[in-house]
Regions:
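A conserved non-catalytic segment of reverse transcriptases
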Residues: 125-126, 152-156
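Hydrophobic/aromatic residues located in beta-strands of well-ordered beta-sheets
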Residues: 67, 101-103, 125, 166-168, ...
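Conserved radical SAM core fold
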Residues: 33-35, 72-76, 107-112, 124-145, ...
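Conserved alpha-helical substructure of the radical SAM core
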Residues: 1-116, 120-121
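Glycine-enriched alpha-helix->loop->beta-strand junction motifs that scaffold or abut catalytic
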Residues: 119-125, 191-194
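Radical SAM enzyme [4Fe-4S]-AdoMet core and its adjacent flexible, acidic
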Residues: 142-150, 157, 161-240
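Short, flexible, mixed-charge acidic loops at enzyme active sites
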Residues: 26-27, 130, 211-215
Length: 240
């Protein structure tokens, strides 16, 4: 009797633009990585794209496959790159496989062409937004330090116009942590968002803060944030 476990489905997240981004969120841990890859060497080539799509589809044991794009900011790769990625999926799709395309973006470059493409191919688009204007603009700023709220709202309107499925990705940070109800009502009532996801911006616990990490949310003035412990060096969040 063969007791070997059956192969399990797995999920991969691709960052075709590497760490390159067109905004400068002050809580982002990833922007400094650009210095490691000069001369655009972090950008995914057409050859690498084809190899990636082929291997992703070929190695999946199950019928459900997610092709997920993130960044940096993936729209910097231009729309034609993702048109080609969809064509490659169709080229290498195995019999019985079903593909879900997902795409995480700050929204600044979205327009009618992008959103028509997303709708045509059934993309689930994650749009990064931290709440109403004053909360969003506290950290999600451009390279000049100017808030990006108006540009993200424009992206939301393009997505809504084309009836694209959208998941709002909101970080929980020092600007909005005490305004959960306001944030939720903004997304639910003003935007009419159907899918919401919240990710805390947290700080690793050091030896000096271990007791506080074990305690969880601190009631000490100025320390009302969650610390965490970890093994290894796989998590790279930065606190604000």
């Amino acid at each position: 009797m063969n007791s070997a476990a059956a192969p399990r489905d797995f999920h991969l997240l691709a960052k075709p633009s590497g760490s390159t981004c067109n905004i400068d969120c002050t809580y982002c841990f990833f922007l400094s990585k650009e210095a490691l890859y000069p001369n655009d060497r972090s950008r995914m080539s057409q050859a690498t794209l084809e190899t990636y799509i082929f291997q992703l589809l070929e190695s999946q044991p199950g019928a459900e496959v997610v092709v997920a794009w993130q960044g940096g900011e993936p729209t910097l790769m231009k729309l034609e790159f993702f048109r080609h990625s969809v064509a490659l999926v169709q080229k290498y799709l195995k019999p019985g496989q079903r593909v879900q395309h997902t795409f995480q973006t700050n929204g600044l470059l979205l327009d009618d062409d992008w959103c028509a493409f997303f709708k045509q191919h059934g993309f689930l688009v994650g749009l990064s937004m931290d709440g109403p204007r004053e909360m969003h603009d506290a950290y999600r700023v451009d390279r000049r330090g100017k808030g990006t709220f108006d540009l993200v709202m424009r992206a939301w309107q393009f997505l809504a116009k084309h009836e694209v499925d959208v998941n709002i990705l909101c970080t929980v940070n020092a600007a909005n942590e005490h305004h959960g109800r306001d944030v939720y009502r903004f997304f639910r009532d003003e935007l009419g968002a159907k899918w919401l996801q919240f990710i805390p911006i947290v700080e690793r616990a050091s030896a000096d803060t271990l007791a506080l990490a074990n305690q969880g949310w601190s009631e000490t003035p100025g320390r009302k944030r969650l610390l965490y412990t970890q093994e290894g060096h796989l998590v790279t969040e930065r606190s604000v």
